């Protein structure tokens, strides 16, 4: 079953294979560490994590580089305002970001590349761009001449040929209407940090950082470059201009971009009170796996409306899957094998990977999982399920969780573990056997008070969390 992605560059869904050998050379834009990352950021980072896992599920090896932008306009402004060095300021938020990634179960890329560790490489690249007549200097800064690169606009599919030659933009982020020659190297303002280099004192512009680190670690042509939709212009457009001017080769074969996230139907904003970091939501009692599930549940090219009700629904969905897994592991089924259910498991597995392979259609993949769970729960209730079907069903769930990674609960202070619940159920069974019904009822009530619901069935006791 072919793996296909929508390529922003071609505006088409294309079959994907690496350019050479079996290794995917992938670069993704990481955080700008000027503050705690918010859930809009983590929508993109969760998409990248799913992308990694789907690539691996298709048998590919990964060489994935993610940058850390630890010098840019916002960082410098905030560090200066707080009277901290650049290193002191960014260390706080870099460590916080990595902790949040771990909490959200995001795999660590093969290489994390902080921009400030590559200043010499950036200066060298700027000098080479100057040697090939792609730059000019003005007031101590160095700018890229967008008129020197005929392909400028091919990623965002805009025509910038009529832009005024020599007009400049100094900020890192700007709109298409303000497309101008952009800064590769910025002369420092009074009080700002800077590096003394062969092209003068200053610091790099945002866009040159990613070009240089991507080429250094992955080569002149990447297989995949991914990020948020907001980076298509100017950041990724400028990366292409710089990189292809440096190498004369296609910078990346595939460009993948995750759509925006809304919160309660509105743009996320601190002024609206709907601005959430991962830490905000966890402090409110929402489990990281519920947040991960909600972020992953909508296909990456569709806008996601993130709501607190959606988080509650995500928890219910996850508990349904956990309860199904628990039934498979604990209920005594009749011996034998149902050929019909074996075929149903094979169909579900094919539908699951088929959805993911069609441009990471997570909604279709999840639908196949829940239809399967419904069918097998019905088979268990009717007595059709056989012990010989258990292993394949558990393997299917494991395959699901190797991508979505939500089945293992995050430990909470004071919350009973599965093993503790099973021990209480065993104690209740022993009390009932010895006809101590008062103790059995007491154990049941204590479990209920802790959010555990017991259900007595013909095949034994089932339990689930509220």
From Swiss-Prot:
SUPFAM superfamilies: Anticodon-binding domain of a subclass of class I aminoacyl-tRNA synthetases, Nucleotidylyl transferase
Record-listed E.C. numbers: 6.1.1.16
Catalyzed chemical reaction(s): tRNA(Cys) + L-cysteine + ATP = L-cysteinyl-tRNA(Cys) + AMP + diphosphate
MF term (GO), any: cysteine-tRNA ligase activity
Gene Ontology CC, one term: cytosol
Cofactor binding remark: Binds 1 zinc ion per subunit.
Subcellular location: Cytoplasm
One of the GO BP terms on file: cysteinyl-tRNA aminoacylation
Sequence positions that bind Zn(2+): 29, 210, 235, 239
Motif 'KMSKS' region, chain ranges: 267-271
Sorted UniProt keywords: Aminoacyl-tRNA synthetase, ATP-binding, Cytoplasm, Ligase, Metal-binding, Nucleotide-binding, Protein biosynthesis, Zinc
Cofactor(s) this protein requires: Zn(2+)
Annotated motif 'HIGH' region, positions: 31-41
Binding-site residues, ATP: 270
Family matches, as Pfam families: DALR_2, tRNA-synt_1e
Domain of life: Bacteria
Alphabetized NCBIfam families for the sequence: cysS (TIGR00435)
Quaternary structure (record): Monomer.
Entry similarity comment: Belongs to the class-I aminoacyl-tRNA synthetase family.
Annotated protein name in UniProt: Cysteine--tRNA ligase
Lineage summary: Bacteria, Pseudomonadati, Acidobacteriota, Terriglobia, Bryobacterales
